[in-house]
Amino acid sequence: MKDLFKIYSNYQPAGDQPTAIASLIDGLESGLAKQTLLGVTGSGKTFTIAHVIQAMKRPTLIMAPNKTLAAQLYGEFKAFFPDNAVEYFVSYYDYYQPEAYVPASDTFIEKDASINEHIEQMRLSATKALIERKDAIIVATVSAIYGLGDPDSYLRMLLHLSRGEQSDQRKILKRLAEMQYTRTNLSLERGQFRVHGDVIDIFPADSEKEAIRIELFDDEVDNIARFDPLTGEILQRLPRVTIFPKTHYVTPRERILETVEKVKVELQERLAELNAQNKLVEAQRLEQRTCFDIEMMLELGYCSGIENYSRYLSNREAGEAPPTLFDYLPPEALLIIDESHVTVPQIGGMYRGDRARKETLVNYGFRLPSALDNRPLRFEEFEERSPQTIYISATPGPYEQEHSDNVAEQVVRPTGLIDPEVEIRPVKTQVDDLMSEIRQVIAQGSRILVTTLTKRMAEDLTEYLSEHGIKVRYLHSDVDTVERMEIIRDLRLGEFDVLVGINLLREGLDMPEVALVAILDADKEGFLRSERSLIQTIGRAARNVKGRAILYADTMTGSMQRALTETERRREKQKAFNLKHGITPKGINKSVEDILEGAYIGKRKTMVAEQAPRYTHWSPQELAKEINALEKQMYAHAQNMEFELAAKIRDEYLLLKEQLMKI
């Protein structure tokens, strides 16, 4: 247990980090249920939590408000803990349209989804790590509170094999089929098995690159090995192996038969209700759909939308909470909720939206009433299942403030950087004054963020600044995550100097180059000008030594007053610490790829100029061969979440395709 978790880092805790770490550890050891880490932007909150995990030696679930932040946290924790099981658990849908019915237009929308195979593998790997290892760190989104396969059924479906044990080949193959693995005679893919004589090759659903080879001699397991399914190279001989099911929703045959009987009983009861209400179309529709599902379950052991029968499959009572990732957590686990001011309300809001959609499906005969139990956890159920919890935020919400038994402040940054100086200026001349400030900041080689209240104003301001010779871009809600990252990358590289937006509070906007944040119409009370939003927005300039914030307002609102008071309190504490310890604030000099996971590297034009000579004299055959090789490398890096490398190779790949088209 001594070195169960080991941090690899060139840095030691500094600033407020040592006291925050000690305070949180003391709270956990004292048995406090809920604590908050109040950490300002750029104070190294992730590093602090990593030290808490290392000290407590307990499996940890970290929840983030969205996939982008979860991916960033996953990358950071994987770098801190390379020897431990750092896993990623988010929704595996690239695209998801839930089934729904619109009574007004009599429109039924079938469930439509595109599943990301790699993320599905990572989800399976996450639950496997929780079952098998004590050193698991799972980074998840709100997907963690949604229904998952019952852990009891899942564990009953494991396939254990040991060298020297008696085991019939047909019995192993039958078990693999029950675990929803499919047989193939071609190349081995994830979730498949292949048979050659007495040799069974299995590519576990939770494995990214390695497959398992079982060699039988008569009815005895003669050899077990890990091998590379691409090259066939044996990597390691094993004394024993455990194969996990292909999906979380596998169920033993006897449970399927029990489920079918219960579904039949509920169907008859529901049909009687609908017929009594003279809802004949709904009754006929429900009978047809349910009977088809029953037939599929009896034949294959599963059906499309099997999760709608999860109440029976997990043997739970009506209204009882569904099994989720929390059911896989050991009792001694830790729960970390990042950006808790966003994540906690998000968790609280999931149940009602899901319920409203499903009630319509039940009322109009598309689903049985038991489908209502295939749902996310209600907030009170989430609270019941939560182990000891640490909330992380620069601006904790009312829930965290009310329920936390201890608040660890992390206001002093390891770099000595001080919160931005805040000025208030009149609204009447805000655009002209802003123009003057922008020109001064650009002359210093820095960047500017401007936040407006409406889309129209953002567009007009962008156009106005552009007409006056300022390189400006507008970040709006229609921009997807990848394009968003590319816009941020261009701002950091100086392709343009000013970024205008409405809500600049989302992830990925902590840029060291930003020296000025301008908040227009700061005195208009509302979500975008609340105390929490103002503090978060002001903090966008906190990574720059010369960081400033200007609030354009004619009156001092309560939110403004509280935000300014809190910012000033932090500044005083930071300055006092720096003075006491003789620290000179240092700017953060991070290269673009360090901060922007998902954005490609370098200037495209420069890259084209550099790469072109290398390929000038290549034949079409050589170019085509190189294009294929680069494509494979690109997808391999993307699968490993090495987005910067993947994007760099993508640029080269596109350049080569362009070159090939010219020949």
UniProtKB/Swiss-Prot annotation:
Gene3D superfamilies per record: 6.10.140.240, P-loop containing nucleotide triphosphate hydrolases, UVR domain
Keywords for the protein's UniProt record, in alphabetical order: ATP-binding, Cytoplasm, DNA damage, DNA excision, DNA repair, Excision nuclease, Nucleotide-binding, SOS response
Function of the protein: The UvrABC repair system catalyzes the recognition and processing of DNA lesions. A damage recognition complex composed of 2 UvrA and 2 UvrB subunits scans DNA for abnormalities. Upon binding of the UvrA(2)B(2) complex to a putative damaged site, the DNA wraps around one UvrB monomer. DNA wrap is dependent on ATP binding by UvrB and probably causes local melting of the DNA helix, facilitating insertion of UvrB beta-hairpin between the DNA strands. Then UvrB probes one DNA strand for the presence of a lesion.
Domain called Helicase C-terminal: residue spans: 430-596
Record's protein name: UvrABC system protein B
Domain Helicase ATP-binding: 26-414
UniProt main location, coarse: cytoplasm
Domain-related comment: The beta-hairpin motif is involved in DNA binding.
Organism lineage string: Bacteria, Pseudomonadati, Pseudomonadota, Gammaproteobacteria, Legionellales
UVR domain boundaries: 624-659
Binding locations of ATP: G39, V40, T41, G42, S43, G44, K45, T46
Residue interval(s) of motif Beta-hairpin: 92-115
GO cellular component entries: cytoplasm; excinuclease repair complex
Annotated gene: uvrB
Signal peptide: none
Example GO molecular function: excinuclease ABC activity
Disulfide bonds: none
Subunit structure: Forms a heterotetramer with UvrA during the search for lesions. Interacts with UvrC in an incision complex.
Domain of life: Bacteria
